[in-house]
Amino acid sequence: MGKTLFDKLWNRHVIYGKEGEPQLLYVDLHLIHEVTSPQAFEGLRMENRPLRRPDKTFATMDHNVPTEDIFNIQDLVAKKQIEALQTNCEEFGVTLADMGSDRQGIVHMVGPETGLTQPGKVIVCGDSHTATHGAFGAIGFGIGSSEVEHVFATQTIWQQKPKSMGIEINGKLPKGVYAKDIILHLIATYGVAFGTGYAVEYYGETIRNMSMEERMTICNMAIEGGAKMGMMAPDETTFEYVRGREYAPADMEKAIRDWKTLQTDPDAEYDLHIEMDASILEPYVTWGTNPEMGVPFSKAFPEIKDMNYERAYEYMGLKPGQTAEEIELGYVFIGSCTNARLSDLEEAARIVKGNKVKNNIRALVVPGSRQVRNAAESIGLDKIFIEAGFEWREPGCSMCLGMNPDQVPDGVHCASTSNRNFEGRQGKGARTHLVSPAMAAAAAINGHFIDIRKEAIISGGN
């Protein structure tokens, strides 16, 4: 019987262990940031251990960094963590994309941009959205601080092999529907736990026709459906994305010959298989307090089916039967490791251009990396957003999570391109609605959610 992409990647990296039991995997790339690494570095010091492979470790700061006045950090905990990362990287010989560096940004954007993220690798990071890197035909998953220390010391990690799930996605995406809507649809349909215990491979016509940036959006949110990791087979789109980047292989053609073997065999079988027709999708909006609580734009919010729904409606200040258009928005956030790449900003700017943010909205655009910010400014996207009334910020995780100065006020509804709508995720009492960048941009200039498939209702003015 043939092997899946996941089987091939896993088998390449097993150092020790029997099938069915935890196995020791070799780690090709360890990405770190300021929040989950300090304890791990301190553990090395206490045991007087070296960091085994600093050349396979790369650091940046993203979670705590301010996105304005970036060198004047007011939060003492954030300042201490950032300074600790600088000190630790210098002491242990780790390459650091420091504050203000041309390579600094959200860790899951910096890896691909620099060419560190490549097909065939096992990539770990002390962050739950490490599945993003699976879009390149890699195994990527998040780890805890104790595991970060283990990788520091050994360049390996113990893991129980998950089962395999194949999600076949075919059909052309309708106008106004994006990669973000695909993953929101999957989670809304099957739930936040449907991927628990699985490594998910996304494939099919729709995936093949996507850019790398779109593919990363889908893999980024694999964890929100419960999966340990999400991945896609590498192809010419992947190879051309990696080619010419700072850390791309010296012998690119040799690497590509190997990467081309990273495909699921025709006779391979997944433990679970799901089919999806992308051509019938609508823009999605979440109404509740986890990504499963989402609806197509044309549908009303569902009836209360259990205590979780009851609590979600109470927290969000909404009721069954309402529609997304009725939500009283106060904030719009375009950013995060899900949707802060150049193509995301270009699509948002296309809608925003020539319009104005409504008076009831405070709108932020936070590029996910310095590279994206520089590229956006080189083609004038910053001017489009600023002229429309958006705040144009420095790179970082920003309003995706309440660990930095960018937070949504208590009780305020925010249209967000991020990946989690948990209670308090964007700040105490914040009410988060997950959408695509286009939906968020249109909401900013209309003052509420609209059906972006109908361009006639995208209008400016205050």
Swiss-Prot record:
Q: Between which residues do disulfide bridges form?
A: none
Q: In which pathway does it act?
A: Amino-acid biosynthesis; L-leucine biosynthesis; L-leucine from 3-methyl-2-oxobutanoate: step 2/4
Pfam families in UniProt: Aconitase
Q: Which GO terms describe its biological process?
A: L-leucine biosynthetic process
Q: Name one GO molecular function term.
A: 4 iron, 4 sulfur cluster binding
Catalytic class of the enzyme? lyase
Q: Is-annotated flag, keyword Flavoprotein?
A: no
Q: Which InterPro entries is this protein grouped with? A: 3-IsopropMal_deHydase_lsu (IPR004430), Acnase/IPM_dHydase_lsu_aba_1/3 (IPR015931), Acoase/IPM_deHydtase_lsu_aba (IPR001030), Aconitase_4Fe-4S_BS (IPR018136), Aconitase_4Fe-4S_dom (IPR036008), IPM_dehydratase_rel_enz (IPR050067), IPMI_cat (IPR033941)
Q: Which family does it belong to?
A: Belongs to the aconitase/IPM isomerase family. LeuC type 1 subfamily.
Give the protein's biological function.
Answer: Catalyzes the isomerization between 2-isopropylmalate and 3-isopropylmalate, via the formation of 2-isopropylmaleate.
Q: What NCBIfam families does the annotation carry?
A: leuC (TIGR00170), PRK05478.1 (NF004016), PRK12466.1 (NF009116)
Q: What protein name applies here?
A: 3-isopropylmalate dehydratase large subunit
